[in-house]
A protein has these predicted regions:
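Hydrophobic membrane-insertion alpha-helices, especially the h-region
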Residues: 15-33
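Short beta-strand element of the alpha/beta-hydrolase
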Residues: 74-82
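Short alpha-helix in the alpha/beta-hydrolase fold that links the catalytic acid
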Residues: 93, 189-195
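Conserved alpha/beta-hydrolase
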Residues: 94-114
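Active-site nucleophile loop of the alpha/beta-hydrolase fold
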Residues: 107-110, 161-169, 183-186
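Gly/Ala-rich beta-loop-alpha elbow adjacent to hydrolase catalytic centers
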Residues: 137-146
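A conserved short beta-strand
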Residues: 155-167, 176-177
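Short beta-strand/loop motif that positions the catalytic acidic residue
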Residues: 174, 180-182
Length: 195
């Protein structure tokens, strides 16, 4: 009789443990889904910049990344969008840069988080052999990932462009130019720890 009671208690403990694991797993999945679906969306102006113009051809590839190709290319830029920002929100900036001769590749990120695809830039520069000067950049979390990518592939880039961002990798001995742009009234970036 004691053996049966022991087995019942063991099964009960197992089922309670499995139920707790299931509830915690579902809660975690729900939290992740809510988190990645709460992001800054592109406005109408940004979406309009996804259209080709007289001087810029806009191409969307199979990865949903967007390339802005100017008629006369002077350099190339691979751009990582900021965390929880719809990547197409950067289309006006990319289109304007392309109007000024810079071929821009605006990378699509899963869940609007560059950290989920830090190597998203792989292979893009090689698709445009006519571009000799390449730069990589990004905004916020995207800038962190772009700088990290540049640190691993320094020979492929002339520099890194950081918009309200910073590098977690040491870029000082890699021969890369670094342009850092931030607002004096930035409420997120900790300017006292920035330099």
């Amino acid at each position: 009789m004691k053996a049966n009671t022991y087995k019942k208690k063991s099964y009960k403990k197992l089922w309670v443990t499995l139920a707790i694991i299931a509830v915690l797993s579902l809660t975690a999945i729900n939290f992740i889904l809510v988190y990645i679906n709460d992001y800054y969306k592109a406005n109408e102006k940004a979406l309009a910049a996804l259209e080709s113009s007289d001087g810029v051809e806009v191409v969307v590839d199979e990865n949903h990344s967007v390339t802005f190709i100017p008629k006369h290319i002077t350099a190339g830029l691979i751009f990582y969008p900021g965390g929880k920002v719809e990547y197409t929100a950067y289309a006006p900036l990319m289109h304007e840069l392309a109007d000024n001769g810079i071929l821009c590749i605006l990378l699509h990120m899963p869940g609007n988080l560059a950290v989920l695809d830090a190597d998203a830039a792989d292979g893009y520069a090689g698709q445009y052999s006519n571009v000799t000067d390449w730069y990589i950049g990004g905004h916020s979390l995207g800038g962190v990932m772009a700088a990290s990518y540049a640190a691993k592939h320094a020979d492929a880039f002339g520099g890194v462009i950081l918009l309200a961002s910073y590098s977690t990798a040491d870029l000082s001995d890699l021969g890369l130019a670094v342009l850092s742009v931030y607002g004096s009234e930035d409420g997120v970036l900790k300017l006292d720890k920035y330099v």
